[in-house]
């Protein structure tokens, strides 16, 4: 049985955790969207539609879970309405959004849903930031270990 490099094993475990965090975040986002769509079906009309969007993406080992506001421009009568996304920023150094910033783009009926969803996603963002830092640290440690091993081999050959 071949022994696996401990750094590779640690990195694999951390990457698996990032994948699990993304899957959990995606599940929360989808439940949020199901609740929004359900309410919108029961209450037709543009005035009842949500103007807040939630998305979850994974690229490499990074997870992006963010909110953006929606604004509509143009004439309904002329059928030239266009949607513009408005970036909602998190406070520096924070893993969660300020609820008043989100509520500024939300309808009254969706505020409790936003509060619940953001509490769950904030915890995932916090853990993901620590896991990605651990992945980077393991990569650096592996690089140092391999460079130390190669320098020892060179010294032994002399």
Predicted segments with their positions:
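Conserved glycine(s) in the ABC-transporter nucleotide-binding domain "signature"
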Residues: 1-158
């Amino acid at each position: 049985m071949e022994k696996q490099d401990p750094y590779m094993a640690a990195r694999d475990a951390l990457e698996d955790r990032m994948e699990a965090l993304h899957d959990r975040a995606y599940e929360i986002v989808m439940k949020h969207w199901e609740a929004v769509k359900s309410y919108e079906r029961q209450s037709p009309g543009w005035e009842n539609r949500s103007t807040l969007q939630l998305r979850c993406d994974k690229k490499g080992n990074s997870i992006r879970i963010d909110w953006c506001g929606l604004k509509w421009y143009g004439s309904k009568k002329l059928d030239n309405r266009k949607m513009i996304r408005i970036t909602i920023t998190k406070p520096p150094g924070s893993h969660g959004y300020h609820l008043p910033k989100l509520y500024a783009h939300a309808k009254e009926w969706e505020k409790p849903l936003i509060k619940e969803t953001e509490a769950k996603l904030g915890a995932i963002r916090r853990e993901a930031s620590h896991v990605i830092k651990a992945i980077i640290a393991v990569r650096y440690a592996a690089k140092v270990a391999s460079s130390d091993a190669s320098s020892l081999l060179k010294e032994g050959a002399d």
